Amino acid sequence: MPAIGIDLGTTYSCVGVYQHGKVEIIANDQGNRTTPSYVAFTDSERLIGDPAKNQVAMNPRNTVFDAKRLIGRKYDDPKIAEDMKHWPFKVVSDGGKPKIGVEYKGESKRFAPEEISSMVLTKMKETAEAYLGESITDAVITVPAYFNDSQRQATKDAGHIAGLNVLRIINEPTAAALAYGLDKNLKDERNVLIFDLGGGTFDVSILTIDEGSLFEVRSTAGDTHLGGEDFDNRLVTHLAEEFKRKYKKDLRSNPRALRRLRTAAERAKRTLSSSTEATIEIDALFEGQDFYTKVSRARFEELCADLFRNTLQPVEKALNDAKMDKGQIHDIVLVGGSTRIPKVQSLLQEFFHGKNLNLSINPDEAVAYGAAVQAAILSGDQSGKIQDVLLVDVAPLSLGIETAGGVMTKLIERNCRIPCKQTKTFSTYSDNQPGVSIQVYEGERAMTKDNNALGTFDLSGIPPAPRGVPQIEVTFDLDANGILNVSAKEMSTGKAKNITIKNDKGRLSQAEIDRMVNEAEKYADEDEKHRQRITSRNALESYVFNVKQSVEQAPAGKLDEADKNSVLDKCNETIRWLDSNTTAEKEEFDHKMEELTRHCSPIMTKMHQQGAGAAGGPGANCGQQAGGFGGYSGPTVEEVD
């Protein structure tokens, strides 16, 4: 059973598999190689991917996207407050964690960001299963290099809820570097800078790639809250203000108008990567008012100027941390859809004194490509190209504990190789202190109050002794997923305690995860039931219209008037029933089908026999479907609304 690689993106996701010595990026059921990270809830069903994004203007309040901007964060995070201004769906606080409130099948539901992400992951898993023809459980999932511990844990939880065994969480730029290194058959030692600007996150990583097989991350930097969505937001704000100026109407109070404007803005942004001007035309945008305008590339660049410039700070930081200067970088590789923006490219090129940028890998697919390679390596694939690949990654943030006076004492420095283990000895602060509280933080500031609290635990039972005498050994063990285990041991008694850091404010408990796994299965069953219901409805609809058409077009003399009227009456009655019972259950559609078949089949058979008797030649059976009218055989045609 192959393992898959999933790029779980803010706006789009992508899945790949390594087979027969190469990576296949797998297209979804719509034929697209990337799938929108959107989940929509309606009064009858749940939609994931393209169908969800396609109906967003009709159902903005119950269509959820950007789950990656919520995952592993606390509700009071200032970034979330900023984002909520742009989201049409409702985000509420549930014990300090953000939850997304929607209406589903007439009921109010609350979902954790992990659950929404797990639905997208389930879609990617199903896409791969449809292509490979077998069930999949093992996967490598990518995260931004700058994701912190709680965001990584939450992503792993989302995989678990989706029924995946997450082999490894790997960093997106590292995955892209794998794709680049293997695709290009690199020789010698090369320093490669990966510039990864996606829909919602931004990462810069510098790697040394040796002979295309040793991939060593030297440094990483970034912003988990900068990407294409932020550029869209600037454009939407600009267009909404222009609309208000022109027509004295503020459309920002209307989620549907705002969503239509956002879709047009996103399209214009893409156009501006290849043209110097984009036209926006939206009919009846707000209160019947059409909106036609033009946006120039120069205006768009001016609107986002500070955001574009902000991409260079992490580049500078990554170079400093790797102790390299600009001239030592051999290749600059662009990853993520937003790197198609000409201004982003020109700023980066100027920063590197006119050095050519490498545009040779597909920016949308490179991360999934690398994840698929890593999945194959971790599941023991020994094929030629990847058997020698060794990937050495680093910790994005420093990790430490709080010592007297609120000082951050670091045990693991940022950019140290992972997996890694560090031990330090601490002591008590006051005489006869019976226990110590170990408070774990991540971040670069000197005082813990300015850093991110990860978790805390108490070690009790320390024998009475003057301050400074007891020896407490604290060990930080950072695993290959970038997830932290902390243990503390009192040396004289040998008493020990350890925790895997589970950021309690941002993390899900095991019980919550188990509940979500069960709910995910329930939703999958509901989706399947809905699909079967639609299949039964379509079968009945198709049958009734076929019978009606055959009878209406039957040549004179083939069918006596009484039979003809009897069939037409029954068909018209069924059509009326269909129109007024659109939400009927599968069993009701099946029952109607049986009823109609019982009534019509004998008459249809008689009609065809008469026809055959009269004509007696070949082709006399042309009105009847293969398999008979009562059967379900013959090809099923998907009908599009």
Swiss-Prot record:
Disulfide links within the chain: none
Location of the region described as Disordered in the Swiss-Prot/TrEMBL record: 609-641
Taxonomic superkingdom: Eukaryota
Keywords recorded for this protein, A-Z: ATP-binding, Nucleotide-binding, Stress response
ATP-binding as UniProt keyword: yes
Record carries keyword Flavoprotein: no
Described function: Stress-response chaperone protein that prevents toxic aggregation of proteins.
Subunit-level organization: Forms a complex with Hsp83/Hsp90 and Dpit47.
NCBIfam families: PRK00290.1 (NF001413)
Entry's family note: Belongs to the heat shock protein 70 family.
Name under which the protein is recorded: Major heat shock 70 kDa protein Bbb
